[in-house]
Amino acid sequence: MEEEKRLGDRNDARRIRSVDGMHAYMTHLMPHRTDAEVYINETLDVTELLKFLETRNTPEAPFKTTIFHCVVMAAAKIVKMRPLLNRYVSGNHYYMRDRISLGFTIKRQFADGAGESLMMLYPEDSFTLRDFSRMIVGEVSEARADEAHGADGALENLKHLPRPLMNVVMGAIRLMDRWGWWPESLKRLDPNYSSVMLSNLGSIQCNAIYHHLNNIGTNGIVLTIGVAHK
């Protein structure tokens, strides 16, 4: 039976109350999210993966499975196996998320001037690669067909606000973000609150880059995937 939320918990996470002194001190030593960034670059051999995808993506397959789908599944499985990766720091406190989430941005069309859409995925523990592919393909198709998909409609409305009013709105958002008052219904649409945020740069023939965190939200892991080389 799932434990009930206590005072100090959040709508998407539970506060960790057994933090050691060193880690409690670090939240004050590095008060901003971008103070604590660490970068790493890894090269993976995908030879066998490409062979597997070639056998999976037959003409009869209902949808195409890609390297990106495999990386998304791997990220979810790693967080499941290493649950400490699903923690975040906000308001100088540590929290453990209630579930694993994956966020990314998609291009509506493969063109320089094409619009973009925010995407959030909430996989189940039992998901297979086929489940991940089906979910990603379905969500992407829906987002490309609906310009008001997810948080996109709200963002389109916000962009029309006068700059002084926008500053007031952003100040209120940052305050609610810090104290855990940001509605869970909005967090579910925003990759800035995901366990892992991904960027598939290989789709535009670009190598992987070092990507910064954003100074809002609770996302602490950003994963970029570059183009596959021989």
Model region roles, listed by residue range:
Residues 1-230:
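C-terminal catalytic/motor cores of large multi-domain enzyme assemblies
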